[in-house]
């Protein structure tokens, strides 16, 4: 799961408008934001194995710190607490929205991953494997992304064109990720991921600021 995670960001913004979209963009990818530097440091492990699934060449064989169910719950609670401490004036439900956004990553990954998501440590691995069904996997990404965006638009956002164009670009990137060439190495995959998440967060911050100026 990649761009489908961002659908949760838009839905969470609809549920709790006080949380900036860029915060929610980071929250829904937080487990991967952790995963990337852990791979770069050699703490978590991934191999590039073209064909291991129909749409994703990553053999994610060791990621107990970022993607086990137990640590996902822990990171979600930590995100809730961090938001409460960093933004003490925000309503309690704002921190809850951030925590739920973080945990949603594991839930959506469970749908698409092959059984490589550990329940705890590096054992009892699960995953429904929708990455092996390209049309369904891509359709799910699109439905989640644009479904969440539709909920966000119900807030009465004044300018929708920029958001929609961004959504189309995101989906195009998803198609490239699914069907383009595999990453050159495990480190290249991790570095590309962290740069991509940062760029997406910066773009959505700019688009939301534009919404605020023109609304």
Model regions and ranges:
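N-terminal membrane-targeting hydrophobic helices
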Residues: 1-215
